[in-house]
């Protein structure tokens, strides 16, 4: 592959519809817009979701659910990610943030058991899954809930 062989992704670029001059051009007179009507006008066209006056789908379907104001959003960290730290390191939410493992603290950090931990670490977090807690302790490390 060379620079001059690069092509934009399919459908990412749209060719501007050029208006013809005269009927013979195939795109003159009404410029492909047909005769009169809303779509022939400047700025014409219906809004998103408009179905010609029929009750639109989004209004025919019932509302569902609610937003729980007490919901807690935890930053998730898997065991396999903890292997990047040295043996005997005290892993805290601040350290995870500093090293770029998590992008923001949200309502705390939760450690999940995806992957395996091979190092002896002291892990401090807000929540642990039971299997993650067992795996850290089995590797000789310790777990502390903040």
Curated annotation (Swiss-Prot):
Residues 1-13 have a biased composition (Basic and acidic residues). Belongs to the universal ribosomal protein uL15 family. Binds to the 23S rRNA. It comes from Bacillus anthracis. GO terms for molecular function: rRNA binding; structural constituent of ribosome. Residues 1-52 are annotated as: Disordered. Residues 21-31, 42-52 have a biased composition (Gly residues). It comes from the Bacteria. Part of the 50S ribosomal subunit. This is Large ribosomal subunit protein uL15. Keywords: Ribonucleoprotein, Ribosomal protein, RNA-binding, rRNA-binding. GO terms for biological process: translation. InterPro entries: Ribosomal_uL15, Ribosomal_uL15/eL18, Ribosomal_uL15/eL18_sf, Ribosomal_uL15_bac-type, Ribosomal_uL15_CS. PANTHER family: 50S RIBOSOMAL PROTEIN L15, LARGE RIBOSOMAL SUBUNIT PROTEIN UL15M. Disulfide bonds: none annotated. One of its GO terms (cellular component) is cytosolic large ribosomal subunit.
